[in-house]
Each structure stands twice: as C-alpha cells, then as structure tokens.
C-alpha cells in the first residue's frame, strides 16, 4: 500500500473487525522496490523515508501489533535472481543498504523503532477512540487510547505536493481537542498525550545517523588478473518463447549461457 499509505490503517481496521481477538501483523511493510534489467535501480525509486514512516504509523493507528519491513536490509543473491527481468542485486532501497550504508530512510525507521521502544507496551493493548474532526480534508487521522489513559493521535498528510500547516479541531470522546498540525507533503507524525497531565510529545523524533569513518582502509592493488575464454561447449537446450529455465528443469542460473541464430536477408 505504499502508493496509498493511509490504506495501511483502513486495511488493518478491516482485519481487526473480521477477527477482533487476533493480533494484526504486517509481514511485508513495503518500503522500497526491486531493480530490473535495463530499468531503474532501487535507489532511484521515489519511495523514501516518508513512506517507511507513514506506513508504519498508519498500521499502528489501525491496531497492528507486528511490523516487519520489506526489506530492512538489502543484499545480493549472486546465484540467481528473484524473478524474470530482475537483477541479482536486492538492495531494494532498504534502510540498511546492500553495501551497509544508511541514509534518511534508516533515520525514519530508527525513529519508528524509538516509538515502539517507548510506547510499544501501551500501544499493543490500546483501543481505537471514536472522534469527529473539522478542517482536515487531506489528513488521515487515527486515535487510540492505552489502558492507563495515554492518548495516541496518528496524523498523515495525504497530499503529495502541499504541506499541511493549520489547526485541527477534534472532538474526542465528547471533549474538544485542538492540534497545531505541521506536516510536510506525505509526512506523518504521532502526538502522544500523557495520561493525567498536560504533557504532550511529538514523535518520531529527529534521529542522528552514524558518523562516517575517518580512517578509511587503504585501496587494494590488483596484482594478478586471470582470464578464461568460454569455449561454448555444453548441453544446449532449445528455449521456446515465453518459457523459463525452471520450466526446463534448470534451477541454477549461475552458468547458463544463451545463443541464437539470426538469418540476414
């Protein structure tokens, strides 16, 4: 649902309605995309930290108690690929990149991790709260209350271009509530109203990324290079159009070569 992040909430709402006593898990919380042969790399996808943050917060707003990013750590499968037309790289635009690097998406997921660390015990047993809202046409809002009375207000700006900066008037369980909402385009936040106090906090907080190492390793000097020319001797199997290697009983793509004959006129 990365193209419509607010649906993460509505879909979890539906699951909870169908199975109210069952936990709701998101096993593949989309946060990136694969790369294709001749196409764009994962890092060129527009899916960024806003999507990683928004989908997680909207899933929690719906009552999800299990989150698993797909993918959190990118990697490469040198023995083959995931599907036809895909590259062997599976960086997937993951928060922790294929080469071990991190960026703004990692910071976004780290911020979600802080929310879970601080409030996970309250959120998993929280209940949805009925509310009315005015002046928030481009917002998706979800409100939950923990057993101790702590209120969690989830907000997502669905507008892809315009920021949302205005007061939001809510009626929560019959009581008025006003929120000064400042959200960039496609951004999301969580307002925590602590029970029995006037204390409110905004999450996720800004995160600090690890510092890049100063003492870099020395470059590697290649002393010897070996070259092997293929002689193209092998068990050649006709491959009809539309057929894949597994359909021919070939399940190891590492050493497969292709040849074709072209008749010129």
Functional labels for PLM-detected ranges:
Residues 5-15, 54:
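Alpha-helical scaffolding within the catalytic cores
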Residues 17-43, 47-265:
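Carbohydrate-binding surfaces of carbohydrate-active enzymes
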